[in-house]
From Swiss-Prot:
Its EC number is 5.3.3.2. This is Isopentenyl-diphosphate delta-isomerase. Homooctamer. Dimer of tetramers. PANTHER family: ISOPENTENYL-DIPHOSPHATE DELTA-ISOMERASE. Keywords: Cytoplasm, Flavoprotein, FMN, Isomerase, Isoprene biosynthesis, Magnesium, Metal-binding, NADP. It catalyses: isopentenyl diphosphate = dimethylallyl diphosphate. One of its GO terms (biological process) is isoprenoid biosynthetic process. Its main location: cytoplasm. The lineage of its organism: Archaea, Methanobacteriati, Methanobacteriota, Methanomada group, Methanococci. Its cofactor is FMN; NADPH; Mg(2+). Pfam families: FMN_dh. Involved in the biosynthesis of isoprenoids. Catalyzes the 1,3-allylic rearrangement of the homoallylic substrate isopentenyl (IPP) to its allylic isomer, dimethylallyl diphosphate (DMAPP). It comes from the Archaea. GO terms for cellular component: cytoplasm.
Amino acid sequence: MNNNSIEYRKLEHLIVCDHCDVEYKKGTLLEDVELIHSGISNCDLDDIDTSIEIFGKKLNAPLIVAAITGGHPKAKEVNKNIAIAVEELNLGMGVGSQRAAISKSYLEDTYSVVRDHTSSLIIGNLGAVNFVEDSWDEEIISKSVEMIDADAMAIHFNPLQEAIQPEGDVNFKGLNILKEIISNYNKIHGKIPFIAKQVGEGFSKKDAIFLKEIGFDAIDVGGSGGTSWAAVELYRIKDEEQKNFSNQYFNWGIPTAASILEVNSAFSGPIIATGGIRTGIDIAKSISIGANCCGTALPILKAALKSSEAVTTVLERMIKELKTTMFLTGCNNINELKSARYILKGDLKNWKDQI
């Protein structure tokens, strides 16, 4: 196998994320969101409803397993374990970039395995840069949707990762072609929700305006504070000078909470909060400041490398924390949580004042 192949790279990413310190050294700024405790609660904890509807699917909680992997036999096992847990809890999940299976059809089952184990919300995944670099069109989207019977399609934007990755594609000029491609897909193949997805560096207000004009239905902010792809690529790089270069961007990006505020100021569609979402409290805070749903990846990857039961345990813990936080803020359902009172402090307050 060529060590520079996409397939090998997918395996490297799994190994690095499981064994190395790849998380940002700075936080998500969710620590600057203070939910106001309700001393009387006026709720029955057992009756609190965490369910939402998004992309035509009802989920038992506003929680999606964010895009992680695909494209290697080991990835098939990970996706299978996640899908089993998602089906049990009626949540959603995304798959990793499907580029590997576009170029090598024998890798399709590392993605399609998810539909063997769940009928819940599945989100496909393609890279924005490939529509420029490789002249992808709506038929590539169609193939990717069919591969996993996707309910929605994420188009990920990862300029930092591509700039640092030894084999990266760095021509992000001309992304406005996505407007025609998305429109063509919807006309030819039937409408599907399109999600603009960041992968750890966040979207700004300016980005949100552009993405809205392109025709995206939802935005996954993918803010900083969780997994740093600069860190992931740092561990893959062999050249010392390139390592030092990559290390300069270890903490680059818009923190998740700030990106939620940035996007929410210019975009009215669903907002998914990813990037350092580790607890149910993080979910509650994200929703209170403007997100509709949240996603988490790294803790799930580590669990999925063990078993589906381990994935279920992590997700159940987060849902329990979310329900408890709603109970402590007097919120009976997610709509009430969206209106929960909070105080912004420190850097996040300063950030909001300058949007």
